[in-house]
Amino acid sequence: MPLSKKEKRILKSIVVASENDPDNPEFPADDPKFPATPTIRIEVPGFSKVWLKDESKNPTGTHKDRMGWEMVVTYRDFLLAKKRGQVKGSLPSLSIITSGSAAVAIQSQLRRYDLPNLKCLIDVNLDPDITKSMKKIGCEIYGTDLSKKPFHWREILTLTHNPDGFDITSSEALDPTTRFYDWLSYEIINNSPDYCFIPFGTGNLYENILNITKKELSTDNHDPRFMGDVKKLRYCNFFGATTNNPKSKADKLYSPHLPFVHYDEQWIRLYRHAGFCGPKSNVYLIKEQYLSKAISIADSQGIDYEPSGIAGLALMLQMRDKLPKNKKMLIANTGKTKYPK
């Protein structure tokens, strides 16, 4: 089935510079660069080498912008398949369970390329101002009690009135743990840290970083984007920071259910046992008192963040008595969403 005029225009407008050429990056679309966001040195009392990967510099303020771009690339795949005559009909819609950040990032990209609006399943208790911001940029909103139970992808599509579409939350075919944040993962591991602290919400970012690390430690034929130190990387401890407190300031890291996450005790134990990461790599619960201290440090240094985004700094402060003070620490700040006014 031939593409319509509109579809031809959309396809032409989606330019993927390269899959993995650091000299020809794909993100952000209007000003591609690698690395796409800066890594800056910060001062943390008691530590001599602390660096912060600052994803707040992305278009809508968080690392989710990278995932948003990958959804545009997915639509490009849909259009190319239709152009080849492999599929028929109109472009499908995408659905997602979201607390706001991912929705704003993805919908901002979809809107820019004139693609179908994102269908968002939100918790009935989500802040009305966030809901209003999402609606303002075209998100279609559907509310339910997300604490009730984990939702199957079929239920997510049903609840978002999207029977012929696809659910981003659950789809393995989208390669969420190797593709959503692959460029970001290289930007992080190329710093060759001894310790890396990463917010753990859906788990996609943590899993991406570990999977890219595993890939580079398992081959002599490195990805062109890899510029790190293999020996150092093998012993890097990757710490995920999360919470099980529904009232935590790090609200984006709390989820009553994570049915689609791969990480579990056995998953990380195998990675450690195979030598794909340092021996202390794991996901840890943060305490609110250390999150408050992290907030004070971030404020004092003009870092743009939300509490969930600097959970890694909180975890470093929480573990400070067990950490060497002269090793290279890298904290991933996943940023702060710029909600449309």
Positions of PLM-derived features:
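Positively charged, low-complexity intrinsically disordered leader regions
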Residues: 2-85, 89, 289
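Phosphate-binding loop/pocket of nucleotide- and phosphate-handling active sites
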Residues: 4-5, 246-247, 311-341
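Active-site/ligand-binding loops adjacent to catalytic centers
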Residues: 21, 33-36, 132-133, 139, ...
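A glycine-rich, Thr/Ser-enriched phosphate-binding loop motif common to dinucleotide/cofactor-binding enzymes
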Residues: 57-74, 169-188, 304-311
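Short glycine/serine/threonine-rich phosphate/pyrophosphate-binding segments
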Residues: 65, 69, 95-113, 128-129, ...
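Alpha-helix C-terminal capping segments
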Residues: 73-81, 104-115, 210-217, 314-323
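Active-site-proximal loop->helix
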Residues: 91-96, 101-159, 249, 341
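Active-site/ligand-binding-proximal alpha/beta "capping" segment
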Residues: 159-220, 289-298
